[in-house]
């Protein structure tokens, strides 16, 4: 229930906030899998005052690292949006065909789709550099953050529930 709640940080990204003792200001650290972290000082109305720090990842880019890409596809029901992340080889050529490796975790509570920026991605970048496209898809049933029906989709079928969504997602890419 969000009635009466006003979001302070509305930028697209995963946010971590820490209010200062006075509660007049807070530090908002946010990023996305495809966007480096921003560390901002904001007032208690959400207005940005100062960028406090900016990470320097130039060496990673020079070494051939590429940001993964976010995507949205439909679930096997052809109604529900599924969010995913894709890692491509550094020398990706859109005219070529690549084998796909899909990271699937049919476990409870949270899936394996990263939402924050990281250079350590459970070997997805390394597999991409071997010539694969690697994807991670947020299957129905993997998170309670999208409501009870979405979260309980795999109830009683922990092993197989994400496979239909995963197959359908790959077919759409």
Predicted regions and their residues:
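Serine-hydrolase catalytic core recognition
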Residues: 9, 16-173
